[in-house]
Swiss-Prot record:
Protein name as it appears in the record: Large ribosomal subunit protein uL16c
Subunit structure: Part of the 50S ribosomal subunit.
Family: Belongs to the universal ribosomal protein uL16 family.
Keywords: Chloroplast, Plastid, Ribonucleoprotein, Ribosomal protein
Pfam family, one: Ribosomal_L16
Name of the gene encoding the protein in the UniProt record: rpl16
GO biological process terms, semicolon-separated: mitochondrial translation
Subcellular location: Plastid, Chloroplast
GO cellular component terms listed in the entry, alphabetical order: chloroplast; mitochondrial large ribosomal subunit
């Protein structure tokens, strides 16, 4: 699963997801892509599940690119802990995704195979997505 090797700070504010994605919203590497239509936090487990589903479906053919990286730590408090006494410990990592962001790209395969593989990956995502073709 993806996570940063090291970060400057262990914990982050949650922040807000307003507006659309102005970067990472064009196809750069492959010919087909999966684009987010809603804002969400996508966990490293979800990213990995989608990647595995795509690569397993195309079977040695083509190449896939993961265009998002989980660089935000999400903290959780221990169960049955009283309020106060600081922020919880980082438990998992998420990628902040805004509408328009490209999640995965694929190349070197036929369109029908790419559409099938990307739709399987889309079912692993917690948001609505769309299949797009470059050009």
């Amino acid at each position: 699963m993806l996570s940063p090797k090291r970060t400057r700070f262990r914990k982050q504010h949650r922040g807000r997801m307003r507006g659309i994605s102005y970067r990472g919203n064009r196809i750069c590497f492959g010919k087909y892509a999966l684009q987010a239509l809603e804002p969400a936090w996508i966990t490293s487990r979800q990213i990995e599940a989608g990647r595995r589903a795509m690569t397993r479906n195309v079977r040695r053919g083509g190449k896939t690119w993961v265009r998002i990286f989980p660089d935000k730590p999400v903290t959780l408090r221990a169960a049955e802990t009283r309020m106060g006494s600081g922020k919880g410990n980082p438990e998992y990592w998420v990628a902040v995704v805004k509408p328009g962001r490209i999640l995965y790209e694929m190349g070197g395969v036929a369109e029908n195979i790419a559409r099938k593989a990307i739709s399987i990956a889309a079912s692993k995502m917690p948001i609505r997505t769309q299949f797009i073709i470059s050009g």
